UniProtKB/Swiss-Prot annotation:
It catalyses: a plastoquinone + NADH + (n+1) H(+)(in) = a plastoquinol + NAD(+) + n H(+)(out); a plastoquinone + NADPH + (n+1) H(+)(in) = a plastoquinol + NADP(+) + n H(+)(out). The chain crosses the membrane at residues 32-52, 98-118, 129-149, 167-187, 255-275, 310-330, 350-370. The lineage of its organism: Eukaryota, Viridiplantae, Streptophyta, Embryophyta, Tracheophyta. GO terms for molecular function: NADH dehydrogenase activity; oxidoreductase activity, acting on NAD(P)H, quinone or similar compound as acceptor; quinone binding. This is NAD(P)H-quinone oxidoreductase subunit 1, chloroplastic. Pfam families: NADHdh. The gene is ndhA. It comes from the Eukaryota. Its EC number is 7.1.1.-. It comes from Psilotum nudum.
């Protein structure tokens, strides 16, 4: 259930009691409503990200980009998605139908589950788990299995090579990513995403982990781009080499699943960069004191109650996340694609030792500080 303010939850429960609705039924309805709201929200986020990528890419190439479908072409992505869903769903005749059909779901579902532990704003989170960040790492590790299933089930050499590349790339960069997350957890003394943000907000903008973990921040950014298969790390679907990689044999809604999953994963990485390193919803700027503590009035049956500016914190989180999105989009059109051996060397020979050394230094610092 989405956590808003306690007063709001208490008043909703009072209304439920007045209407005679059982608490169990209300909990089920509220959970379903929360999940549907999340799905709708992240889907709208994907549409906005695709539109932004088209516009930014067009600007970097001195083109117009989407222009006519809706204001500033913002509905062009929606129209393209509808057209894609109306196409024929083709299944390879000699492929493994079970693996071919199940693979896209295995790839997309873990990405959706990652949103459960992301605090979109102050007290705006579906599930504040005590192991939130490692829940994200755990569900993300399921994705390579789905990629291998799609590559093998397609009965296509390009798809199979793309699946192998994707699995190798994901495994190679997930370890440095996890080590960076562990370093942040040591500094915050918690694995909860909410606790990590609150630990940074104690000291304002100077308390952000960006300043305390600059090396980890760089490793996390590079590993996140590799996990999202963004240029220069898009080897699993390199068009010049593998047609479309593990997506080669897919069409219609199944191909759309990969498309949605890719941008959802990019948004997840952007939000975790914000939560782990950029203070989440916190925006305590030295030249704007008290901005993070602006309150708004909320009218209820009990009178006027002051609550934290939840929606302001939501927009602050999104603005920070979209800064990372801009970096990833700009990198797509400025950096060349690396070779497979270079990608693996970067992950295993450089990022992994650096992330491990950063973790050891962080642990040593914490021991000296606490000792």
């Amino acid at each position: 259930m989405i956590i808003f303010m306690k007063d709001f939850e208490e008043q909703v429960m009072n209304l439920v009691n007045l209407l005679g609705i059982s608490k169990d039924l209300f909990f089920i309805l509220w959970t379903v409503l929360s999940i549907l709201t999340l799905l709708l929200g992240v889907t709208m986020g994907v549409l906005v990200i695709v539109w932004l990528e088209r516009k930014i890419s067009a600007g970097m190439q001195q083109r117009m980009g989407p222009e006519y479908t809706g204001p500033l072409g913002i509905l062009q992505t929606l129209m393209d998605g509808i057209k894609l869903l109306l196409k024929e769903d083709i299944v390879p005749a000699k492929g493994n139908t079970w693996l071919f059909n199940l693979g896209p779901a295995i790839v997309v579902i873990p990405v959706f589950l990652s949103y459960l532990v992301i605090p979109f704003g102050q007290k705006m989170i579906l599930s504040d788990l005590g192991i939130g960040v490692f829940f994200w790492i755990a569900v993300s590790s399921i994705v390579p299995l789905g990629l291998l299933m799609t590559g093998y089930g397609s009965n296509n050499k390009y798809s199979f090579l793309g699946g192998l590349r994707a699995a190798a790339q994901s495994i190679s960069y997930e370890i440095p990513l996890a080590l960076c997350v562990l370093s942040i957890s040591l500094l915050s003394n918690s694995l909860s995403t909410v606790d990590i943000v609150e630990a940074q907000s104690k000291y304002g903008i100077l308390g952000w982990n960006l300043w305390r973990q600059p090396v980890g921040f760089i490793v996390f950014i590079v590993s996140s781009l590799a996990e999202c298969e963004r240029l220069p790390f898009d080897l699993p679907e390199a068009e010049e080499e593998l047609v479309a990689g593990y997506q080669t044999e897919y069409s219609s809604i199944k191909f759309g699943f990969f498309f949605i999953g890719s941008y959802l994963n990019l948004l997840v990485s952007s939000l975790f960069v914000t939560v782990l390193y950029l203070g989440g919803w916190d925006l305590s700027l030295p030249f704007l004191p008290g901005l993070n503590h602006i309150t708004m009035t909320w009218y209820s049956s009990d009178g006027i109650t002051e609550v934290p500016s939840i929606f302001l914190s939501f927009f602050i989180t999104l603005i920070k996340a979209f800064l990372f999105l801009f970096v990833s989009i700009a990198a797509r059109w400025t950096l060349p694609r690396v070779r497979m051996d270079q990608l693996l060397d970067l992950g295993w020979k450089f990022l992994l030792p650096i992330a491990l050394g950063n973790l050891l230094l962080t642990a040593s610092f914490q021991l000296l500080l606490l000792g």
